[in-house]
Amino acid sequence: NQTPLPMVMNILLWSVLGILGSFSVAWFGMRINTYANARTAFASLKGKAFPVMSLPLRSGMSIGVLLICVELVMMIIILLFIPRENAGACFIGFAIGESLGASALRICGGIFTKIADIGADLMKIIFKIDEDDARNPGVIADCTGDNAGDSVGPTADGFETYGVTGVALISFIVLAAGMSYTDNGSLALMADGIDIQARLIVWIFTMRLLMIITSVVSYMINNWFSKLRFGNKQDFDFEVPLTSLVWITSLLSIAVTFGVSYVMIGGMGEDLWWKLSVII
């Protein structure tokens, strides 16, 4: 049996959207990091340590929240507007597209960085100009390469990883949840299998949305406390606010996970709500 042409084109469309999504968030990440680097350098001239810590953290939060929101919106569009018989293939196409885009960006960023390093070294050897000398054009190329390798690649990787794991979870639910073994040993959908699968998929997307909210709220709380504590200090240990951010985010996310899971899937039996909460 041949796959209908409209379905093939739909899958290809979502593959292209996955590639464009990876490229878009990578561009945004590089743009934000460039601004953050410049503003952090100027903020350091004031002699205050807190802005030097808070600006990079804020830029990282903006990149992370944006790429997750874009990913989540695109997956919800597939879930809501693509017919059930085509949604699975579109999810796979989307995951393949963003993986291809992330791979290309990661490789290209690394190659650009290495070429810039080699160029700077050649200038040092041939023209006796140090690799960190402002007269060496490899210095600018190396800075650009580092920005490409450290911004473009990780941002696209984050976008791809978040999407691929979501597709894997949905695939597992569709293929395994709500299924039972028949007398001949084969798997078959239970009477309420569709309802179980739907509830679990809604639960997954709800948890993903709530984790964005808990992350932003945790960042705002930690930033407020850190500013009160370190705002006027000339120097402090940068690991302290970062560690407190990890603790606040973890505790808040765990509490929200268990509470919302109990409300949404608490009646599914076999204490499934707390088992899934522990897993995620």
Question: PLM features: what roles do these ranges have?
Answer:
Residues 1-280:
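Hydrophobic packing and interface segments
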